[in-house]
Amino acid sequence: MINKICGKIVEKRESSIVIVALPFEFEILVSSFCNAELGLQEDVEILTYLHLREDEIRLFGFLNVSEREVFEKLISVDGIGPKAALRILSGIKYNEFRDAVEREDVKLISNVKGIGNKMAGKIFLKLRGKLVKVNEASSGVLKFKELEQSIVNMGFDRKLVAAAIKEIMLIDEFLMLRQVDQEQFLFREILRKLSG
C-alpha cells in the first residue's frame, strides 16, 4: 500500500491534484475541501488510499488520518465505492459527516449529492458508533509528547497541558491543518488557553 506521498503540487484540477515526487508524477483524487487547502507549487505530505481494480488503479488523497479513516469506513458501506465516498466528503466535511452519523441527522446526510434517505439509513446502520473521535484525542498526547514536555518545562501543569492538547485536537480548525502546521497551532493555542 502507498501510505503517503511527499512532493510538490504542479497541477490542480477540479477533483484531483498532480504531485511530482521524483522520478514519478502522481494524480491523486481529493475532496473539494482538501483541494481548497492546497496551493500550486506547495510542498505537501498527502496521505493516500490505493484503489486497485482489474480495469483501473486510483490514488485517493487526504490531509490527515481522520479524513482517510472516515473514507475507508464509508467504502465499507454496501453501495458506496471510492468515488462515491469522495463525493460525499466533498459535500460535507469529514468531521461534520462523522458527527451527523452519530446524531443520525438524515437531513444533513441526504443533502449530499447522490445520498438519499435509503442510503443515509444504510450509512447509519453500518457506521454509527464506529466513527468516534477517541483515536484522535487519545493519541494526541503521545503524538505531541515533546511539545507537551516543552510547555510543562515553561511551568505549566502536565495534566492541564494534556487536557488542552486533547481538547484542541478535536476542533475543526486543527483537524483541517496539514500535519506540518499542527504542532505550531497546538503550541500557540495551548499557551493562549492556559495563560488566559
Curated annotation (Swiss-Prot):
Cysteines engaged in disulfide bonds, as pairs? none
For the region Domain III, give the residue spans: 139-196
Concerning InterPro entries, the annotation shows: DNA_helicase_Holl-junc_RuvA_I (IPR013849), Hlx-hairpin-Hlx_DNA-bd_motif (IPR003583), NA-bd_OB-fold (IPR012340), RuvA (IPR000085), RuvA_2-like (IPR010994)
Q: Tell me where it resides.
A: Cytoplasm
Which keywords does this Swiss-Prot/TrEMBL entry list?
Cytoplasm, DNA damage, DNA recombination, DNA repair, DNA-binding
- Annotated region Domain I: the residues are 1-63
Pfam families associated with the record: HHH_5 (PF14520), RuvA_N (PF01330)
Q: Kindly indicate whether the keyword DNA damage belongs to this entry.
A: yes
Keyword DNA repair attached? yes
GO annotation, cellular component aspect:
cytoplasm; Holliday junction resolvase complex
Q: Its Gene Ontology molecular function terms?
A: ATP binding; four-way junction DNA binding; four-way junction helicase activity
Q: Where is this region: Flexible linker?
A: 135-138
One biological process term in Gene Ontology: DNA repair
Q: What is the stated purpose of this protein? A: The RuvA-RuvB-RuvC complex processes Holliday junction (HJ) DNA during genetic recombination and DNA repair, while the RuvA-RuvB complex plays an important role in the rescue of blocked DNA replication forks via replication fork reversal (RFR). RuvA specifically binds to HJ cruciform DNA, conferring on it an open structure. The RuvB hexamer acts as an ATP-dependent pump, pulling dsDNA into and through the RuvAB complex. HJ branch migration allows RuvC to scan DNA until it finds its consensus sequence, where it cleaves and resolves the cruciform DNA.
- Family per record: Belongs to the RuvA family.
Assembly, in brief, is: Homotetramer. Forms an RuvA(8)-RuvB(12)-Holliday junction (HJ) complex. HJ DNA is sandwiched between 2 RuvA tetramers; dsDNA enters through RuvA and exits via RuvB. An RuvB hexamer assembles on each DNA strand where it exits the tetramer. Each RuvB hexamer is contacted by two RuvA subunits (via domain III) on 2 adjacent RuvB subunits; this complex drives branch migration. In the full resolvosome a probable DNA-RuvA(4)-RuvB(12)-RuvC(2) complex forms which resolves the HJ.
Name of protein: Holliday junction branch migration complex subunit RuvA
